[in-house]
């Protein structure tokens, strides 16, 4: 995880991309996650792996319209798979767009295409957030590399693995 970037920008800056590429080029990481900008930023496919530059504000109060990206969030589901040679790879990366409710309270609300809880603000508002998120996430080629929207009512939940009993 790196804490870098220009606040409220939907485009990663030189510090973010330089640091993320250096981390990936080290060979020590299979996924790099960035936060700090309080805005959704692209997911970049990089040498067969992925960099998530910004997931917005998962915990937020409403921002004024000029900083509306501060009211938008991105939930990521990253599924890793162990390969036969013992290395790990990202075998599925999905995103779900979300916003807070601005009409009197702050509440996480998915604006995913399948609208699992119904309309957050209005059909037009929700669609605007969703499409702005889609365009931003895919701005560096994520969709072409298999990254997709997480449809909360259609994608099966990942299995829950119970912790092993401690011997003692």
Cite the ranges covered by each PLM segment.
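Short acidic, glycine-rich surface-loop motifs adjacent to enzyme active sites
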Residues: 1-11
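Alpha-helix initiation/capping motif
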Residues: 12-13, 110
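Short, acidic Gly/Pro/Ser/Thr-rich loop/turn segments
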Residues: 7-8, 60, 100-102
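A short C-terminal boundary segment appended to hydrolase-like catalytic domains
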Residues: 67-168
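Conserved beta-sheet core of the metallophosphoesterase superfamily
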Residues: 14-74
């Amino acid at each position: 995880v790196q804490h870098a970037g220009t606040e409220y920008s939907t485009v990663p800056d030189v510090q973010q991309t330089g640091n993320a590429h250096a981390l990936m080029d080290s060979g020590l990481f299979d996924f790099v996650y960035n936060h700090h900008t309080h805005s959704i930023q692209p997911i970049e496919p990089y040498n067969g792996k992925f960099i998530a530059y910004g997931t917005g504000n998962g915990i937020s109060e409403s921002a004024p319209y000029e900083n509306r990206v501060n009211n938008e969030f991105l939930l990521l589901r990253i599924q890793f798979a162990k390969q036969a040679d013992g290395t790990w790879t990202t075998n599925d990366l999905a995103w779900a767009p979300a916003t807070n409710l601005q009409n009197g309270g702050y509440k996480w609300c998915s604006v995913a295409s399948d609208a699992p809880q119904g309309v957050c603000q209005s059909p037009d508002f929700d669609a605007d957030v969703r499409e702005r998120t889609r365009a931003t996430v895919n701005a560096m080629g994520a969709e072409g590399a298999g990254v997709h929207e997480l449809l909360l009512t259609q994608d099966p939940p990942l299995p829950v693995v119970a912790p092993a009993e401690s011997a003692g």
